[in-house]
């Protein structure tokens, strides 16, 4: 492809956008796959772009957005969907650079902050996660007004059982509501990309081009054998490198790989299967690297010591201490157990080449743009569902694709560590699977019961689908409907409709007089055969059904064994969501979670009325931890042993529990989750929680955040439950009060006496306890402090004059705001008041 075809000046883009790309981002020519995709995008067509990591997919999407907003549909809006919050922040930064130059407002939607709401309402381009967009379409359907283009990044995560169904429903709903909107999907290479493009009516652009050539190799013990090269037109490397043997211990191939790449000025990413492995590997590599730097680059140790000291000062756990120690040797680990501040420090240090190596779990490959010259996938198996399984090819390719930094590295090196058996034979098998083998097809995960009941209720409650025919039509527009037989799809829908009706989340408002059969694919001889004893029909499906979530019964619990045991819903059936169903959909929780919460809360009310067993904050936290929406902490093998501290805790709180569960691994995980939350709101130090339960600060924060959200959901569900008599409503109110108190304590991590103080900006639970020990109980007490007490407070460690003045100013602002609100309330006429 010649240069004129790749020149920005030939795209017809606004002059100021071309100027921005050339002057700010240094882009004058498009990469070949970008140039191949841009004509389709510029013309406004739906486009699916499947090219390797770091090949410039995002720029194509940005061009499409600017073209729609400033050329094709002036005054319209764009939505950029990402699967992860970390990726949202990255895209937000890039789009804000564009927006500042072109006078376009960029908004972010990843949580519930009030500032986000204002951004969402006012922005021209909204960057959001799939879950946030789904929630917005339920609560604020006007978010789609004026939208002319939608970008779905990391589209291959449609294959993910957790995130995939929401992405699939979002795309189906957007196509249903906005059939004329342009859809741009960005994906890694997948096996059935053409079928996916057909589903979305998109032009498919596939390329293997990379900005930096990528050499794939297997590493068996210390023997490195290059297997394939994915070339770039910019590369001077034409052939595979020769096999060679690395220097170093056979027992530590990661060190051999690191010392080898570091000697040539490169960095290393090591992917391992678990958090524990990431920390252990980083610790070993850091110790070796620290000795190496002491001999060869002692100046580097000074810079690393500064970073280590910074991490140590902010550390509140053994894991944080370990991270700070690893960093002394230029190595760090990266996983979901880290706090956000720790991840940010580590990522920036690696980007700035202060760190030479990161050990990480596979989540890094999907979420953060941190390329390195060399990638080593140390672990190709993962422990899953009680057994060790090989990783999918797609996932490994994502990791390997992080090798090679554009503009910095002459080539990327993607290495696969081969373990066990005959090294040569294992290496050949690994190469055949992960280097030369095909990538798996993407399959819809929407048929799984959690996904189907969640999105089916949403479609009825907030999606405007009120009859069986329209429901079927909508779900036929999903990838599940595109790739599966009609009868399989309709049976999944109908079984879940029956469950939602049974649980009173929806009701039938106009039951059809005559059931219509969906079994139009069943031959006539089946009717006669099925009446014979012992004869049933097995339906062949194009993909394997998704297993029920471990630890839960299937919500439908239908026990379907043959054709006669299932009754389909009539096509003319009408449905509407109940008050409970509407609220559950708005709360964005699984209907099964709502059902579990409702059952437990009803038991709690009966206990309060009868004054039998206790209902405590622990009771409520344990109930929440039993729902599928809560990510339970899993007990370690030692914690499952009889006589363990966790077993003892389970026995002590048995009378407080609101749900019945067997004493198994999952049940102990629920107790552990509630106990972790209890330790948090009883003001235990994060180090103490880590010592007691082995839970890192990042996990404490993520679980307590989830707990707070689900306690709010429990409150709303209880308020909409209509089974109790009027004489018992006072007891319901008592339980609502306990839910509110528990949620406030969980969110603040403190005892009840500090709840007023932690409302003050800049006052967390530790500072609130310091104030309490000085006799300060309320924000008003702060305003009454004498100069002597103020000076005493300013002198305390971690406080200081500036902080104290800010806190006092914050309290004053709260007091003024409350006075203004009181006056406004006093001026508001009462209902029925005459206004002459």
PLM regions: where:
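Conserved pre-motif I regulatory segment
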Residues: 2-50
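Conserved SF1/SF2 helicase motif Ia
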Residues: 67-90, 177-178
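Conserved C-terminal RecA-like helicase domain
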Residues: 80, 96-107, 275-352, 357, ...
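Conserved helix/coil segment N-terminal to the catalytic DExD/H
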Residues: 111-148, 344-348
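SF2 helicase catalytic motif II
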Residues: 131-134, 140-179, 183
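Conserved interdomain linker/interface between the two RecA-like ATPase lobes of SF2 helicase motors
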Residues: 172, 186-284, 332
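Conserved segment of the helicase C-terminal RecA-like domain
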Residues: 374, 381-383, 389-430
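C-terminal helical accessory/scaffold domains
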Residues: 494-496, 502-503, 507, 513-517, ...
């Amino acid at each position: 492809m010649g240069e004129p075809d790749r020149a920005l000046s030939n795209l017809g883009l606004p002059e100021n956008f071309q100027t921005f790309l050339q002057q700010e981002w240094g882009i004058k020519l498009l990469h070949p796959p970008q140039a191949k995709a841009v004509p389709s995008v510029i013309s406004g067509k739906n486009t699916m772009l499947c090219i390797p990591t770091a090949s410039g997919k995002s720029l194509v999407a940005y061009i499409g957005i600017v073209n729609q907003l400033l050329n094709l549909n002036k005054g319209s809006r764009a939505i950029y969907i990402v699967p992860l919050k970390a990726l949202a922040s990255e895209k937000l930064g890039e789009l804000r650079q564009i927006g500042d130059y072109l006078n376009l407002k960029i908004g972010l939607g990843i949580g519930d902050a009030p500032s986000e709401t204002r951004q969402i309402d006012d922005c021209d381009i909204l960057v959001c996660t799939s879950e946030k967009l789904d929630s917005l379409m339920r609560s604020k359907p006007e978010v789609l007004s004026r939208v002319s283009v939608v970008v779905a990044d990391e589209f291959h995560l449609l294959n993910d059982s957790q995130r995939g169904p929401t992405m699939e429903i979002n795309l189906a709903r957007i196509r249903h509501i906005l059939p004329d909107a342009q859809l741009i999907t960005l994906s890694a290479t997948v096996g059935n990309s053409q079928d996916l493009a057909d589903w979305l009516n998109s032009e498919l652009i596939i390329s293997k081009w990379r900005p930096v050539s990528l050499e794939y190799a297997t590493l068996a013990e210390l023997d490195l054998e290059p297997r394939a090269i994915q070339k770039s037109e910019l590369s001077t490397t034409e052939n595979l490198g020769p096999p060679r043997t690395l220097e170093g211990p056979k027992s530590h191939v990661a060190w051999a790989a690191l010392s080898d790449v570091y000697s040539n000025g490169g960095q290393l990413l090591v992917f391992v299967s678990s958090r524990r492995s990431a920390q252990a590997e980083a610790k070993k590599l850091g110790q070796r690297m620290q000795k190496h730097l002491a001999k060869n680059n002692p100046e580097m140790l000074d810079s690393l010591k500064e970073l280590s000291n910074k991490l140590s000062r902010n550390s509140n756990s053994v894991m944080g201490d370990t991270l700070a120690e690893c960093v002394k040797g230029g190595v760090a680990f990266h996983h979901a157990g880290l706090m956000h501040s720790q991840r940010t420090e580590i990522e920036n240090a690696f980007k700035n080449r202060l760190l030479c190596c990161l050990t990480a779990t596979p989540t890094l490959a999907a979420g953060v743009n941190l390329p390195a010259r060399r990638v080593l996938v140390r672990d190709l198996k993962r422990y899953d569902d009680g057994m060790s399984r090989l990783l999918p090819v797609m996932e490994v390719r994502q990791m390997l694709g992080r090798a090679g930094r554009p503009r910095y590295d002459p080539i990327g090196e993607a290495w696969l560590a081969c373990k066990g058996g005959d090294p040569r034979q294992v290496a050949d098998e690994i190469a055949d699977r992960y280097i030369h083998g095909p990538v798996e097809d993407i399959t819809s995960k929407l048929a799984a019961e959690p996904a189907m009941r969640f999105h089916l209720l949403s479609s009825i409650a907030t999606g405007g689908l009120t009859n069986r025919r329209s429901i079927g039509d909508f779900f036929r527009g999903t990838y599940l409907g595109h790739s599966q037989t009609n009868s399989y799809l309709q049976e999944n829908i109908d079984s879940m409709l029956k469950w939602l009706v049974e649980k009173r989340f929806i009701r039938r408002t106009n039951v059809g007089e005559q059931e219509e059969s969906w079994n139009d694919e069943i031959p006539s001889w089946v009717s006669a055969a099925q009446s014979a004893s012992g004869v049933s029909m097995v339906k062949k499906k194009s993909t394997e059904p998704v297993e029920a979530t471990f630890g839960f019964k299937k919500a439908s619990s239908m026990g379907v064994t043959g054709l006669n045991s299932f009754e389909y819903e009539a096509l003319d059936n009408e449905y509407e969501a109940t008050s409970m169903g509407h609220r559950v959909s708005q709360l964005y929780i699984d209907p099964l979670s709502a059902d579990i919460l409702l059952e437990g809360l009803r038991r709690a009310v009966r206990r309060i009325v009868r004054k039998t067993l206790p209902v405590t904050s622990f009771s409520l936290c344990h109930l929440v931890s039993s729902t599928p929406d809560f990510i339970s902490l899993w007990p370690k093998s030692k914690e499952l042993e009889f006589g363990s501290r966790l077993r003892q805790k389970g026995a002590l709180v048995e009378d407080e529990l609101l749900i019945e569960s067997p004493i198994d691994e999952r049940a102990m995980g629920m107790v552990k989750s509630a106990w972790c939350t209890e330790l948090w709101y009883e003001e235990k130090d994060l180090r103490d929680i880590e010592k007691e339960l082995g839970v890192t600060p990042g996990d404490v924060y993520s679980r307590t955040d989830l707990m707070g959200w689900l306690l709010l959901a429990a409150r709303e569900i209880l308020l909409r439950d209509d089974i109790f008599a009027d004489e018992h409503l006072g007891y319901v109110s008592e339980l609502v009060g306990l839910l509110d108190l528990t949620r406030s304590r969980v969110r603040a991590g403190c005892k009840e006496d500090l709840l007023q103080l932690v409302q003050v900006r800049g006052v967390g639970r530790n500072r609130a306890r310091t104030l309490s020990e000085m006799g300060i109980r309320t924000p008003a007490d702060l305003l009454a402090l004498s100069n002597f007490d103020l000076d005493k407070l300013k002198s305390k460690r971690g406080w200081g004059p500036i902080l104290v003045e800010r806190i006092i100013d914050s309290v004053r602002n709260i007091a003024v705001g409350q006075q203004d609100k009181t006056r406004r309330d006093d001026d508001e006429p009462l209902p029925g008041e005459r206004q002459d």
